[in-house]
Every structure is written in C-alpha cells, then in structure tokens.
Amino acid sequence: MEYSTFGKHIIVDLWGVDFSLLDDIHFLEYHLVNAADCSGAHVLNVSKKEFQPYGVTVLVLLSESHLSIHTYPEQNFAAIDCYTCGTTVEPKIAIDYIVNILKPERMHIKRLIRGIGEIVTTD
C-alpha cells in the first residue's frame, strides 16, 4: 500500500492565557487527548513533562502524526503544534478545541500544507 505524503500542519502561539491552566499538566493532557479525538485522530501515546518552577510540555503521539503544547505560565504563553498526515484528520478541529479551552487574549497562527513539494502557507 502506498501512502500519500500530504499533510496539514498548524502552529499557534497563544498569549494572555491564565497561569493556572498553563501549569496544570493533567488538565492539559486531558484536553489535548480530547482535542485529538474530536479531530478524528487516533492517539497512540502521551508523553508529558513538568518543569520547575513552572511550565509543561505535553506531546500526544498520533497514528497520523502529533499534537503538542509547550507552556510558559509565568509569561502567560503557550506554543501549540498539530501536524496530521493524509486527509482523514482535520487539525483545525483540535486547535479550535484547545483555543476555546485556554481562551487566550491574542493568538498568532500559521497553517501549512506539507508533503506536496514546497511547503505552502494557507493563511
């Protein structure tokens, strides 16, 4: 079976997010897994790390690629990354879910199409 190299990649910077949300590893793990499920992705594994004195990284390994968040609670900042291979999963659904949960004051987003030759931005 031959697989397509086509993929969608969304990267997001969130600013003005509540400190307590960004420093709660269990809250973030729960919601990243739920976001992945809502997007149609298949979760294979979750890796997570708490940093001292603040900050969290959660990586959700997907059959279709990955969803991750890196937080800097003391700066009210989170970096989110969602890459999905193929056409069966919609990373925008996962990103929208997370943004709605974290309620940032502002965000910056880039949408990329990958695996078609050149990397193409779609925003």
Model-derived regions, located:
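Polybasic/polar functional segments that serve as interface/processing modules
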Residues: 1-123
